[in-house]
Amino acid sequence: MLVIINGADTDVPESTTVTNLINQLELTGRIAVEINKQIVPRSEFDSRLINNGDMIEIVHAIGGGQST
C-alpha cells in the first residue's frame, strides 16, 4: 500500500504497525511519529496500524542546548 513518509511516496506491506515501519526503515534512538497530523504515543507503536494513504512524519529527537 502507498503512504507518504516525510513527503516521499513509500510502499509498505499491509498490516504494518508503526513499530514494523520503524524497523523496516532501520531507525533507532528517540523517535517521534505523526500520522495524519496526530502524534502517535510510543505506547501505541506496536498496535497502531498504518493505512493506505496515511501521511506520516518521523523525526529523531535530538538533545542539546546552550552550554555556558
Regions found by a protein language model. Give the residues of each.
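Ubiquitin-like/PB1-type beta-grasp interaction modules and other compact soluble beta-rich domains
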Residues: 1-68
